[in-house]
Regions:
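Glycosyltransferase donor-sugar binding loop
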Residues: 45-46, 187, 208, 233-248, ...
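Membrane-proximal helix-turn-helix segments that form the acceptor-binding/catalytic region
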Residues: 85, 109, 113, 126, ...
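Acidic donor-binding loop of glycosyltransferase active sites
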Residues: 157, 276-296, 309
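Conserved donor-binding/catalytic core segment of Leloir-type glycosyltransferases
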Residues: 160, 198-215, 221-226, 235-237, ...
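Carbohydrate-associated surface elements
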Residues: 165, 186
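Nucleotide-activated donor-binding/catalytic signature segment of Leloir-type glycosyltransferases, i.e.
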Residues: 246-272
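Short hydrophobic beta-strand element within catalytic cores of glycosyltransferases
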Residues: 301-306, 310-314
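Conserved acidic donor-binding segment of nucleotide-sugar-dependent glycosyltransferases
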Residues: 324-336, 344-350
Length: 399
């Protein structure tokens, strides 16, 4: 059976977040089981144009890249038209990473036109707040969704969601009968070992991600400044993508008295070192509700837990069950609740923290294995399972 993969960006593309990372993890998991695919994507990366031999999508897979230009964030390039049409025509089934970008739109339309089986991973594209924002403020984009995106999605054999919130958003737009495959993203953990506890006094936290409102870091910093102790430290690592928001972030840095350090973008090896030097990863996405944006999953949470790092996360993502799983603390989307979670973290004994660390790593091994989760998606994509469209409740729902 010939399987095609369409993505806007693929690893090691720099600057495009978790979608490219997730595409690589899933395809490599399939390759480890002997499943071979053909990948079509743009050559876009903010540091250079990718070449097929650079792409990290698994051994034995064919990679076809087209030239991206103009609207490079959306993977625009006229070469996508023949490349994606050819892929859809020659494939028995196609897996599409994302919605509303140039290659993803083409793939959905071509699959529908050719009568091909296809699955679409939303990657946050229909999160409730995101849809509400488009409807209210972006009439041209909303028209694009109505005319092109939604009709194609309704022809998919399954919509791949990673959390209950993402599932609710998809069904709100596409209808209650929309066939949902709810399976979380996996994380590659086998080459990693849980790191020992950080040395030195104080509580050490880290935030990994873009400095933007969707991530909620400024709201979290305001909470942090209210409760931090003299020896506590917070490190922020990630690019700035919003000048106004970044100015506010810099003002908060100045108020921190050196307790907050900004390191900018870090390569993967340095990210892992930062996690190892921290007691907790923080993911406050959605804490600043103005603008209504938040993440659908949060791959960085899984990556942190793979290194034995418990987490502090805002509720409403894929991680509301971290306390039940004893892998961290969850807080409501308010600064007051974030302060409460921070105080709980500050009060932990070394033994209590070590238990959270152990359970975080164990959770990843049991629930977020990319090969096992990838097989669930593969079976639906290839019609090898009796898929009914009822969500498969996996680790993302923590129940």
């Amino acid at each position: 059976m010939k399987i095609g993969i369409v993505a806007t960006h693929v690893p090691p593309a720099l600057g495009y977040g978790g979608v490219a990372v997730t595409a690589g993890i899933l395809t490599r998991a399939w390759a480890s089981r002997g499943h071979r695919v053909t990948v079509v994507a743009s050559d876009e990366s903010i540091d250079h144009r990718l070449k097929p031999q650079e792409v990290e999508m698994g051994e034995g897979n064919e990679v076809r890249l087209y030239r991206s230009y103009g609207f490079r964030r959306w993977g625009f390039g006229l070469g996508a038209i023949p490349a994606i049409y050819r892929l859809c025509r020659e494939s028995d089934a196609v897996y599409i990473h994302g919605i509303a970008t140039w290659p993803c739109t083409l793939a959905g339309l071509f699959c529908a036109m050719l009568g091909k089986r296809f699955v679409v991973a939303l990657h946050g594209g229909l999160m409730p707040e995101h849809v509400a924002l488009i409807r209210a403020r972006k009439p041209h984009k909303w028209l694009y969704y109505r005319l092109l995106t939604f009709p194609a999605l309704r022809r998919a054999v399954a919509i791949h969601c990673t959390s209950a919130t993402e599932t609710a958003g998809a069904r709100a737009v596409l209808g209650a009968g929309c066939p949902i495959l709810q399976v979380p993203n996996g994380v590659e953990y086998r080459h990693l070992e849980a790191a020992p506890a950080p040395a030195g006094p104080g509580l050490k936290l880290c935030f990994l991600g873009h400095v933007q409102q969707e991530k909620g870091i400024n709201g979290f910093l305001r909470a942090w400044l209210k409760v931090r102790r003299p020896e506590d430290r917070l490190v922020v690592a990630g690019r700035s993508v919003d000048a106004g928001y970044f100015r506010e972030f810099q003002e908060l840095l100045e108020q921190s008295g050196g307790s907050v350090e900004y390191r900018g973008y870090l390569p993967k090896a340095e990210v892992n070192r930062l996690l190892a030097d921290s007691h907790f990863l923080v993911l406050p996405s959605g804490l600043e509700e103005c603008g209504g944006m938040r993440e659908n999953f949060g791959n960085v949470v899984a990556e942190a837990m793979a290194l034995g790092r418990p987490v502090l996360v805002a509720r409403g993502l894929a991680w509301d069950g971290v306390e039940a799983a004893q892998t961290g603390f969850a807080f409501e989307r308010s600064e007051e609740s974030a302060c409460t979670a921070l105080r709980r973290a500050q009060q932990l004994t070394p033994e209590q923290w070590s238990e959270l660390s152990r359970k975080a790593r164990g959770y990843v091994e049991r629930q977020l294995d990319p090969v096992r989760l990838g097989e669930k998606v593969w079976k639906v994509l290839t019609a090898a399972s009796d898929f009914t469209g009822k969500p498969l409740r996996e680790a993302c729902s923590h129940d």
